[in-house]
């Protein structure tokens, strides 16, 4: 036992992490520590940015998914994910989080979700596939880059270029303003050429 939680067997989902004391809403339940950098997404990967995947050390990697989780995610100073209570947790209760709180896409769980929650989505999905009301419910308890991607996508749909946090247009996505300026210059050149030929 360590820090208010321990590993136990569950009835249907193998091992899980269970609280050995109570936790209040907003209280840090587990502190994340990055154990290794990964080159791709998989069942135990935590996504820290659009292209960065890591493996968390300790029992945090054993926390099971739930479509109605009692924990969410906050980034700590090292960039790892801490698990924070989003509901009161009592001693003996399983500590859970939604895998969509840390990964934009989840494609490695083909079987049906086994969380047993009344709000079960039937399959484990990533943030990208969450309904908007669930995203709103999780606000403040997800990896920040997930909401950054949503904001960027909304900006793109509105016709603005995709930018990084500093507001710089991404090189792989052309700036529509630059394209429009180029179109105006080309049109001006054609008019000038037509006038000079007349």
Predicted regions and their residues:
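Conserved catalytic SET/PR domain of SAM-dependent protein methyltransferases, capturing the structural core
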Residues: 1-198
């Amino acid at each position: 036992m360590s820090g208010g939680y321990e590993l136990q067997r569950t009835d249907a989902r193998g091992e899980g992490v269970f609280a050995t004391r109570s936790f209040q809403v907003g209280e840090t339940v587990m502190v994340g520590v990055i154990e290794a950098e990964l080159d791709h997404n998989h069942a135990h990967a935590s996504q820290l940015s659009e292209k960065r995947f890591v493996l968390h050390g300790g029992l945090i990697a054993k926390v099971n998914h739930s479509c109605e989780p009692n924990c969410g995610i906050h980034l700590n100073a090292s960039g790892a994910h801490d698990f924070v209570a989003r509901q009161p947790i009592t001693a003996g209760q399983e500590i859970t989080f939604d895998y969509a709180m840390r990964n934009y896409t989840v494609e490695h769980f083909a079987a049906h979700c086994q969380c047993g929650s009344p709000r079960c989505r039937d399959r484990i999905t990533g943030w990208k596939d969450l309904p908007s009301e669930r995203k709103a419910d999780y606000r403040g308890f997800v990896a920040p880059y997930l909401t950054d991607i949503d904001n960027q996508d909304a900006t793109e749909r509105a016709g603005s270029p995709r930018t990084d946090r500093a507001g710089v247009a991404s090189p792989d996505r052309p700036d529509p303003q630059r394209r429009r300026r180029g179109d105006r210059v080309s049109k001006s050149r054609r008019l000038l050429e037509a006038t000079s030929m007349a």
